[in-house]
Amino acid sequence: MNIHVADNAREAARMLLRNMLAVIRQPSGAGGEGDTVNVAFSGGSTPAILFDVWVEEFAELTPWNRFRVYWVDERCVSSENKDSNYRLAKIHLLDKIPLTSEQIFRIRGEQEDAEREVLRYSSMVLSQLPLDGRIPVFDFEQMGIPLPSFLGRRNCFILWLLMRLVLILLPGNVALL
């Protein structure tokens, strides 16, 4: 893992996006040229910075037709709730880029039967992602570091899988690749 310290959070987001797009342009593997790019988002407030920079500065450079978007965590709330990770991504990214509904795979946090939703989402992810052996793998995963107030919560979904490149934007100005 490489640690990069930027002058500010927006510059850290730029570092992450430049790195991701460079990998996508490689001839093959990890979302290389022509491959489907499977990216997973987490929640919290920090991704908004990443999404905003992506839309403002990197949208035209991103091959959106190759992207499939997933989530690795979601709170058990409606997709319209202010605490929904999907809602954050929708407002700051998804409503501003040319993705179709067939490219977006969200966790349905509003489902009353959380266990059933976990099974549905897990099965769908298993059927969509490429495998490393028998384990599904995301090409990129944007992760956050949970605040202490979030740790120990039970009203959320969390999905842990392998990923080829982890993009971590910490509050402040640190990018981990």
Identify the residue ranges that each predicted region occupies.
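Ligand-binding beta-strand-loop-alpha-helix segment within the catalytic cores
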Residues: 62-139
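Boundary/activation segment at the start of structured domains
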Residues: 4, 23, 51-56, 68
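N-terminal glycine-/serine-/threonine-rich phosphate-binding loop
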Residues: 1-39
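Alpha-helix termini
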Residues: 24-34, 58-61, 127-135
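Class I SAM-dependent methyltransferase SAM-binding "motif I" and its flanking Rossmann-like core
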Residues: 140-175
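Glycine-rich beta-strand-to-loop/alpha-helix junction loops that act as flexible
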Residues: 41-46, 143-145
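A glycine- and small-aliphatic-rich helix-loop capping segment at beta-alpha/alpha-beta transitions
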Residues: 52-63, 87, 147-156
